[in-house]
Amino acid sequence: IYEKLEPGGVFAIMEYLTLDSFTSSPPHKSFDANTAAWNNFYLNNGGDAKIGTYLPALLQKAGFTIESQKCVGGMSPVKHRWWNWWRDAFENFAPTFVKQGLMTSTDFDELKDHWKKQEATETGFIYSAIIVQIVARKSY
């Protein structure tokens, strides 16, 4: 990417800092099984769900100057947009995790049940994966 950018060109990146922060309140084993499945899915497919922890150093080593970095994510109560986004992600990806043996169908069924119970009480929340946003610039 560095070689393809013009001098002064900007590279904006949004990547996982960590998926390990991902949890629900109250905690539930099916939620934790899903979080582990996400991590293993990335690892099994050449990815790294902790890339954000060392991405700034990789960018600097390549010659970029880091202009901005911040983290997003955090608490998402029931019906928050991130709550809804993750619900949809679970429903879309969990069957793949089950098919690949990364989580059991029982865990998936329990996760759906846990999610519905949380939505009904309106007191539950998730603490989402932390994502790092980086703006890096190629030297002039």
Map each language-model feature to its residues.
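A short glycine-rich, Lys/Arg-flanked "PGG" loop and its adjoining helix->strand segment in the class I
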Residues: 1-10
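Generic preference for hydrophobic/aromatic residues in regular secondary structure cores
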Residues: 2, 23-26, 126, 131
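Conserved catalytic/acceptor-binding region of the Class I
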Residues: 10-80
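Conserved Class I S-adenosyl-L-methionine
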Residues: 49-53, 60, 65-140
